[in-house]
A protein has these predicted regions:
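Short glycine-/aliphatic-rich beta-strand segments at the starts of folded cytosolic domains
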Residues: 1-7
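Short amphipathic alpha-helix segments
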Residues: 8-24
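Residues that cap or initiate secondary-structure elements
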Residues: 9-10, 41-43
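Short, well-structured beta-strand/strand-turn elements
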Residues: 26-33
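A generic structural motif
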Residues: 33-40
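Charge-rich, low-aromatic oligomerization/scaffolding segments with amphipathic character
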Residues: 42-56
């Protein structure tokens, strides 16, 4: 499992990240201020998604 701190993301950023994760079939959970990605092998893909959405 890979953890991302989502507390600094806006509501819009989090919604966009969730939408993209769902579109790509990445299994995840939101737990408080953490985004938990269930498959360690998806880490690089999720990194790219998060970076592309939060750096705009």
């Amino acid at each position: 499992m890979v953890k991302y701190f989502a507390g600094d993301w806006t509501v819009q950023e989090l919604a966009a990240i969730e939408q993209e994760l769902e579109r790509q079939g990445v299994q995840y959970t939101i737990d408080g201020e953490e985004l938990l990605v269930h498959d360690d092998h998806q880490e690089r893909r999720v990194d790219m998604i998060v970076e592309s959405i939060t750096e705009t």
